[in-house]
Amino acid sequence: MGARLGRRAGPEAGSEAGAAAGCGPAPYERRVRWLREIQSTLRERRPERARQLLRLLRQDLGLERTLLPDILYRDVAFLNPVDPISHDLLVNLARDLQCPKKDYELWKSSDKICRQLIYHLTPHSKQQQGSSLRQRKTQSCLKSSLQKTLLAGETVDLSGIPLSTQDVQHITRYLSSHGAVLAVLDLSFTGLSDELLHLLLPSLWALPRLTQLLLNGNRLTRATARKLTDAIKDTTKFPALAWVDLGNNVDVASLPQPLLVGLRRRLSQRTSLPTIYEGLDLEPEGSAAGATTPASTWDSTAAGLGPEPQACCAR
């Protein structure tokens, strides 16, 4: 099932440990840098270099198993269960670069897709101001958010606020006294590492009405996904949780099947989640029987990238 949780190759792979530990640029910053370079190479009429960068980006996001024959010749209905928006945009960008429209300048169409990806992969609304003003504003927002009394079904939005260990401790105390009615907790783009989230987890899984936990754009790794999977298996933890957003982190390229199944069991009013593709055949018709992707790739690593077919099509 789904995109593999694979190793990254190339010179950028060495920065993974630093990103996960909270030092160095966040993973989304590296991805945005590649997208901006794709834009510049297309303006310089260097499409081959743009394809190489796109391949790096796809691999970094865990989409290296999405082969071009599927992109070019099949209706790609399968989407990455962690970040379907990025997957859809990357498929469109790959199609654009491999099969440029004859009546339209290549860079214009691809540049638009790159801008959409950059918007999606960054805390765009929080990057409009200077760094010093942003820091003052975010610390003020954190303080005010942790002082208010919550109403039933309310959301606590801490997205874009860089969190320290001390901040996480404040959040833990706040949740223990005010979290009984909390429905959605947004911790996107807060710089959370596995260690910081580990401090929060006991407070989070005790929340009786928490339905959504948003952890997009942080420094989390597969270790966090494993911890969440183990917690979901315990019916006394996260009793109301329906969705976890782990997209755009270090190496969480697909959610493990046990986590998805555990989330589905918490949705008594629905029979399935849109992110569970049971029985979906991802192989072209006539392919070998043993070539299908296993339903769970949790303990496997992606095979090395081989040469991709350079087929093209007229558009």
Curated annotation (Swiss-Prot):
What are the start and end residues of each LRR repeat? 182-195, 207-220
Coiled-coil positions: none
Q: Which UniProt keywords apply?
A: Leucine-rich repeat, Repeat
User: Where are the annotated segments for Disordered?
Assistant: 1-23, 284-315
Question: Per the record's keyword annotation, is Iron-sulfur included, yes or no?
Answer: no
State where composition is biased (Low complexity). 11-23, 286-297
Q: From which domain of life does this come?
A: Eukaryota
PANTHER family linked to this entry: LEUCINE-RICH REPEAT-CONTAINING PROTEIN 75A-LIKE ISOFORM X1, LEUCINE-RICH REPEAT-CONTAINING PROTEIN 75B
What does this chain do?
May suppress myogenic differentiation by modulating MYOG expression and Erk1/2 signaling.
Which family would the database say this protein is a member of? Belongs to the LRRC75 family.
Indicate what this protein is called per its UniProt record. Answer: Leucine-rich repeat-containing protein 75B
* The encoding gene: LRRC75B
